[in-house]
């Protein structure tokens, strides 16, 4: 057994120690139990009587042998650690000297053949082999005294195993004696042997002091004995480890099962600090906060979530502590693998570009990854908080996606430019389109994003952002959508100007239009749309007008829609409305079940009631007369409406008596009335929630209320009950501890336990959250603890659920399988309708029922004809009756017809992957059976269903078969060199040719219609095969030959262009080049020349006249690239760029200005005049734009347009340099005098003086700013002062 202690064992445990076990006199006392002269020692080992006779027979006792082998093993380790690599002698595993046999009491027996194996080794020695090479039994590479090693030996004859446990002195519990004490090693090992039915031999090496335990027995018993030895003898230690708080519930498990399992398996004691009922929560409850905790990561630089931590303490032997630690770490790692990141540093202007058209980019990012990307929609509102991008999922995927989005954002900031467009707010909805389709369409077509201001804001500015080459197209599409609809607005408030409160009447009319949908017929008649104000706008105190917007495609339609709207508004004078106050709790009686009362009033009295328009607390009900006047006077109509309103109110009050009561409860007890998350109040109100209102403390609309008030209002009997229960709760709250100690337990049928708990504990968790109780469910028993009222409500709900489960019934109905399809209906619509109607579940047989063993076996049909129905007894019976009636009906209308079709047409009838026949089945709701295709010319097709549907399906099948009969095949000879010209880029020319000949452009149909041969012979390669309808084939043949003839007559033309113009000729992604080729029916060959100083020779292939057209288009592109430079002082850079001149040059002259990147230079301010004295102080200043630096701007476009643009730039530069600014100090209260009614005066001054005048709107700001030429500014100043002087003279 020399090698036994050296076998390497994979272990995750720390090293162990034991004190030396000596073979002293105490051991000799055990030898007397063995008869004298016996030649064997019991394999119970040292503790079960090591025989002196055996010692004389072999020279050494088993313990001495083991001790000697320990010493030899240590010597072997030293040799292994030396630098010599001499070959080790082989070990004879059957040697009696090396491995002495321990004989039984009955006499000697044959040596037992054992196989010493490593736990992780894949190669094991076979029992019965003569010897085992030392190389096959590796020694430990190092002599770690603290390591724990074990080997396993399986004995084939008895199914026993042998395991060796070696403990170093450091890993043994201190002050442990071998024998003689109750807690000695001998007593401990004897107890373990008795408990586990194993045999254990113990020895200690004299040099290393390592203690070896040789354990024999069944596998499970050996493992249990090993664990007990480590628990009782091994070194004790205590470890602490951090743990996220939200994972504690998962570690504990349901009713502590997980924690108990870990402690039992590892023989440890685990302590978890108490924290807000953490120890009582189940593992299912623990899963809920996991997502919240994982949402902690908020920035790109910190993707690791920051969890609230607690400390877990583990006590036990050193191996058990480490095993328990690993189990807990596995649970923690499992529940912290995901994370969530919020990215808020990316500009919201880039969100649409990052999202892509219709979220295309998001789908690509999420595809194939455990990742969820949420990029919100952005609005042009700098004051609004940033709505961040949210990434959720697996950590590495989230980090990768975050880095990618940041890179994309930086790239977009460099390669895109924003443009602000002032567009009236009323047109924003047309840019956005329904559900944002307009903005997505612009993004898809131009690559530019459009950002609108918030709906509730007052800004008119729309932002368009995209690449510089595409921004003009994005602006064009945006303006096109904005101007695609004509908009008009009608202020209906003016129709009620004579009323005391025109806004109230106009808002009632608007609400009536919203409720009664009276504008829909006008919209259909006039081809317009009416946009009514929102209810919030009609309720606003600041809004004093009701505006209805009209939009349409033509001015005439909008004008007609306006006239119709005004006519409709005039039909509803103020006399047709009457307001009555009805308690909100009574309003549901006014409405009636499903609105029956409102419908009755509408039919009998021609009135419409506007109920609860402004929320549940709105007591106002508006009675609107919508019938004809019939000659009645306004007073008569008002009287009739008043009588009807009082009748409605009296009827509602008669339906239920509303009372209110206020009880005084000290505010400190209000929290007990409400309960955790409102649970107690919910339990008190119960099913009377719609009939009772409970308000605690002071409220604004009851001025006399106090902090101690509890206000209850509702139906009298419900108010009486709620008051009584609130008083009881307050009484109970005085002793809070007793209140929460109420417990209710009851038994129920054990088979319903999983139904009470719910999937993943969902039912129990829901009750805990709603009613704030603790629930423990065991097999057939439930225990509920919490507030008495909550416990009673919880028990009532669970008992109700159990009663429903007990009532659960399963019925099996036999219906022929041929009718199942009709009973289920298209997409299961009939069976779903049956399930919803009777609240049952219906299960039809499936094809995989026989192979699929998962799922609910009770609901699985036992035969192909069996239908299973499950639910309440009465519901199941009713569902069965209706199902059988439906079966009888289907059986009575079943109709079958069979036709024969050509066998060659079968594949066309079936279609690719069965698509054609499936479409016919779905379209006509029939069943189609196609016979086996044999060598016969025809194949039978059987169609079953309703007679009309069968006949229609047969017509469809016959049409396909007839089409196949008309198919022909032709082979035409066309030289291979012309094939690519016939096909064109991506098959575009071929598609157009087929379309001209009446064929389909579907790619599948095209591939079937025409094929270009790739044969081996020259004749095959010059062949084109046409296969399809005779007329199309003949037309296609003629057209292809015509095209080939045209190709033979083609010529090559060359044109030279500067290399700098090549990009404009090719266009983005080759679009311009393809456009030229398509319009001129030519092909362009453009060589790759990189030197900008060289010219590029473009070859044009096509007919002579088409080549000339292509030349003209290329020359036009070259002409549009004319460039001229202009010198601009850096001091005017900012003024020119901020103006609208640059936009006008692009839009009007199609000219582009390339400006260098410079830092703007601010001009020097020069004061021309300064008059601080006088009634109105003023100052006139100008700016000195002359500076030492200037830059060259490049102007590109057509030559004549470039010259015009340069003239405009020079003129603008001159105006900027000559501009003056006047600052006029005018008191704020006089500003309206210079503005005039509707801005008439100030606009007149602007027009006369040709200047810009800015009047401040901020209170307290008195400075009026005038900008323009010096003469104009002085003129404007004089006119303003004259106007103010005239007003003073008049006063």
Curated annotation (Swiss-Prot):
Protein name in UniProt: Vigilin 1
Organism: Schizosaccharomyces pombe (strain 972 / ATCC 24843) (Fission yeast)
Top-rank lineage group of the source organism: Eukaryota
Disulfide bond found in the keyword field: no
Residues bearing PTM Phosphothreonine: 935
KH domain span: 166-229, 236-328, 339-405, 416-486, 575-644, 658-726, 741-798, 808-883, 894-957, 967-1040, 1050-1114, 1219-1280
Alphabetical list of InterPro entries matching this protein: KH_dom, KH_dom_type_1, KH_dom_type_1_sf
Record-linked SUPFAM superfamilies: Eukaryotic type KH-domain (KH-domain type I)
Protein role: Required for cell survival under thermal stress.
Biased composition, class Low complexity, residue ranges: 73-88
Keywords: Cytoplasm, Endoplasmic reticulum, Phosphoprotein, Repeat, RNA-binding, Stress response
GO molecular function terms noted in the UniProt entry: mRNA binding
Cellular location(s): Endoplasmic reticulum; Cytoplasm
Compositional bias segments (type: Polar residues): 1-39, 268-281
PTM sites of type Phosphoserine: 115, 934
